From Swiss-Prot:
This is Large ribosomal subunit protein uL18. Keywords: Ribonucleoprotein, Ribosomal protein, RNA-binding, rRNA-binding. Part of the 50S ribosomal subunit; part of the 5S rRNA/L5/L18/L25 subcomplex. Contacts the 5S and 23S rRNAs. One of its GO terms (biological process) is translation. GO terms for cellular component: cytosolic large ribosomal subunit. It comes from the Bacteria. The keyword RNA-binding applies. The gene is rplR. It comes from Alkaliphilus oremlandii (strain OhILAs) (Clostridium oremlandii (strain OhILAs)).
Length: 122
């Protein structure tokens, strides 16, 4: 008999499997994405030093002023552009994309496209 496993449990197991394979370095940090129901958060993380190099979210004033709702693909694309701009200011142009176990679709895809438009390579 099959057991029903929640979507979140599946996402967490995907995330653990991916995190065992990728790490962020100072030259190529990990672009980590956390998606909640109402917002999206992004960090560039150096796993060697355990430091967050750059962060952006849909709660930033620059994003909130431009969009009416923060939990949609439009806001995610703006967050991607913002994190890309901040990363380039710090001299970071290549990253490793960690989608946090989420499927590459919708808000996650929009965020990645926005970061690529801003100049990040992954």
């Amino acid at each position: 008999m099959f057991k029903k496993v929640s979507k979140n449990a599946n996402r967490l197991s995907r995330h653990q499997r991916v995190r065992n394979k990728i790490t962020g370095t100072p030259e190529r940090p990990r672009l980590n994405v956390y998606r909640s129901l109402t917002n999206i958060y992004v960090q560039l993380i150096d796993d060697v030093a355990g430091k967050t190099l750059v962060a952006a979210s849909s709660l930033d004033k620059e994003i909130k002023d431009q969009v009416s709702a923060t939990g949609n693909a439009e806001a995610a694309k703006l967050v991607g552009q913002l994190v890309g701009k901040r990363a380039l200011e710090k001299g970071i142009d290549t990253v490793t994309f960690d989608r946090g176990g989420n499927i590459y679709h919708g808000r996650i895809q929009a965020l990645a496209e926005g970061a690529r438009e801003a100049g990040l390579k992954f």
